[in-house]
Amino acid sequence: MTLNLPDTIKFVITDFDGIVTDNCVYIDSKGEMTRKLNFKDVMAFSILRKNGYHIGIVSGEKNSAIEIIAKKFKVEEVHQDIRVKIDVIKSIIERYKLKKDEFVYIGDDINDLETLKFAKYAITVPDAVNQVKAIDGIQITTAHGGNGAFREVVDCLVK
């Protein structure tokens, strides 16, 4: 599916696991959890910054990959270990005085449902849970989470 986003978008807000990562957690011999990132998706953060977009990451989990990405690319809004994402999204919208056609939300799981239904522009990945893919009007990337999906959204915005 070809994504369709307007020129009015100023803020890209995304979940992390399942969108920027492949939704897998790797556990090393010391019991530390790590995640794999695709460089296409990492580069997408740089492209957004260079083109004047605001960026937000709202994740249900806390992990060091988010902190590294946020610091490197000066992500304005970073919220980890969030159970009720809609409250955070509404707070961001209020703080930045955004209209509903000025932000896009990208998510893939049940903890994103309420936010995806609230967003005028909602995007998910092919491997999202069925409840997310069934949302009326949701757009689905061609690329899977952690394999260029975030970059696909960014490439749609930055032509």
What are these regions (language model features)?
Residues 34-35, 86-159:
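Mg2+-dependent phosphoryl-transfer enzymes with acidic/Ser/Thr/Gly-rich catalytic loops
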Residues 1-84:
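Alpha-helical substrate-recognition element adjacent to the catalytic core
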